[in-house]
A protein has these predicted regions:
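Residues at the starts of beta-strands that form the adenosine-phosphate
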Residues: 6, 86, 180-181
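Glycine-rich beta-strand-centered segment in the early N-terminal region that forms part
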Residues: 25-43, 54-94, 100
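Cytochrome P450 core scaffold surrounding the K-helix E-X-X-R motif
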Residues: 46-52
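Residue-level marker of beta-strand positions
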Residues: 85-86, 105, 176
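NAD(P)H dinucleotide-binding glycine-rich loop of Rossmann-like/cofactor-binding domains
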Residues: 90-158
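Glycine-rich NAD(P) Rossmann-fold beta1-alpha1 loop
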Residues: 132-133, 161-168
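Surface-exposed amphipathic alpha-helices with a cationic face
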Residues: 167-176
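Adenosine-nucleotide cofactor-binding segment
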Residues: 175-219
Length: 219
């Protein structure tokens, strides 16, 4: 691959915030000991905020956003990875503090990477992305609490925000794990979608309006 490649660059000069796809070279990439050819990235809520400069999440400009990506190692100074390894990155404030995945080439700390499982394509990894990772960790936490603290199997699980990215994947995972999933959503047009994912019951979000916000999460 040429030393020049395309990346989405966001910049802030005074009150002027810009987004532009530009050609850059590898000298632009600041941090990391592993260089990756990015195959896929995705779009998360935090990405949307960063792309609109919401929440002032990015402190240094110019910047390359994109909190997730999958790809193939081009160069490595990290003993854990070698050229040709297929890898996944999610989290570690990449795309926020460190340059992210909205680029044809990325350079990151090898400790942020994991090797891609052989039964998962790079595209599938990014279809799941941060939302899938978060949902799975939540499901594991429910299972752990069930086994360690409750002493008996939990039957019913309530998923709020069920039609969103994290929520919809959580509905699918939890139903596959054998739980009766009660999906809360304010979008009636998503009812059939949630049923197809495995929700046993759909609850209108309005039923929770006015209730105390001091409810504790199970995870």
């Amino acid at each position: 691959m040429s030393d020049q490649f395309k990346a989405l660059i966001i910049n802030q000069e005074g009150e002027n915030f810009t987004r532009e796809v530009k050609k850059i070279d590898r000298s632009f990439l600041k941090h990391g000991d592993v260089t990756i050819k990015v195959d896929y990235s995705d779009l998360n809520f935090k990405d949307g905020m960063i792309l609109k400069n919401g929440g002032r999440l990015v402190k240094e400009f110019p910047h390359i956003p994109g909190i997730d990506f999958s790809g193939t190692v081009l160069e490595s100074d990290n003993s854990k990875f070698k050229e040709g390894d297929e890898v996944i990155l999610t989290g570690f404030r990449v795309g926020e503090v460190f340059y992210g995945g909205y680029s044809q080439i990325a350079k990151v700390n090898g400790d942020f990477l994991v090797k891609k499982p052989k039964n998962l394509t790079s595209k599938q990894a990014m279809i799941l992305g941060t939302a899938g990772f978060t949902s799975l960790m939540s499901a594991f936490a429910i299972k752990a609490r069930e086994e360690l603290l409750l002493g008996e199997k939990v039957k019913d699980v309530l998923v709020t925000g069920a039609s969103g990215g994290v929520g919809s994947i959580a509905v699918m995972i939890l139903s596959k794990m054998g739980y009766d999933v009660h999906a809360v959503t304010g979008k009636k047009d998503k009812n059939d979608y949630l049923k197809d994912l495995g929700a046993k019951n759909i609850i209108d979000r309005k039923e929770f309006e006015g209730e105390s916000k001091d409810r504790k999460s199970v995870v």
